[in-house]
Amino acid sequence: MGNTSITIEFTSKFWPYFTLIHMILTPISLLIIITIMIAILNKLSEHKTFCNKTLELGQMYQINT
């Protein structure tokens, strides 16, 4: 019985800190993931725009010659 009471006491002291850390880390990690995804999408859209511009230039060059 002595072990059980020590375990319950430990978990009851530990649980609020665990919850607090979890509540702090969850939004931070979500923000990090979202910003990384936004950065990747911006890079992809810039690359796509660059490819479209070079393709249009190539087509214009073929038409002009």
Swiss-Prot record:
Residues 1-20 are intravirion. Residues 38-43 are annotated as: Interaction with small-molecule inhibitor. GO terms for cellular component: host cell endoplasmic reticulum membrane; host cell Golgi membrane; host cell plasma membrane; membrane; virion membrane. Keywords: Activation of host caspases by virus, Glycoprotein, Host cell membrane, Host endoplasmic reticulum, Host Golgi apparatus, Host membrane, Host-virus interaction, Ion channel, Ion transport, Membrane, Modulation of host cell apoptosis by virus, Phosphoprotein, Signal-anchor, Transmembrane, Transmembrane helix, Transport, Viral ion channel, Virion. One of its GO terms (molecular function) is channel activity. Homopentamer forming a funnel-like pore. Interacts with glycoprotein G; this interaction occurs on the surface of virion particles and infected cells. Interacts with host BCAP31 (via C-terminus); this interaction is direct. Disulfide bonds: none annotated. Four species of SH have been detected in infected cell cytoplasm: a 7.5 kDa non-glycosylated form (SH0), a 13-15 kDa form that contains one or two N-linked carbohydrate side chains of the high-mannose type (SHg), a 21-30 kDa polylactosaminoglycan-modified form of the protein (SHp), and the isoform generated by alternative translational initiation. Of these different forms, SH0 is by far the most abundant protein detected during virus infection. The chain crosses the membrane at residues 21-44. It is found in: Virion membrane; Host cell membrane; Host Golgi apparatus membrane; Host endoplasmic reticulum membrane. Channel activity is inhibited by copper. Also inhibited by small-molecule pyronin B. Viroporin that forms a homopentameric ion channel displaying low ion selectivity. May play a role in virus morphogenesis and pathogenicity at various stages of the viral life cycle. Accumulates at the membrane of the Golgi apparatus in infected cells and may facilitate virus release by modifying the secretory pathway. May enhance host membrane permeability and disrupt cellular ion homeostasis, which can be sensed as damage-associated molecular patterns/danger signals, triggering NLRP3 inflammasome activation and inflammatory immune response. Glycans are attached at residue 52. Residues 6-15 are annotated as: Interaction with host BCAP31. The record marks 22 as: Involved in opening and closing mechanism of the pentameric structure. Belongs to the orthopneumovirus small hydrophobic protein family. It is a single-pass type II membrane protein. Signal peptide: none annotated. GO terms for biological process: monoatomic ion transmembrane transport; symbiont-mediated activation of host apoptosis. It comes from Human respiratory syncytial virus B (strain 18537). This is Small hydrophobic protein. Residues 45-65 are virion surface. InterPro entries: SHP.
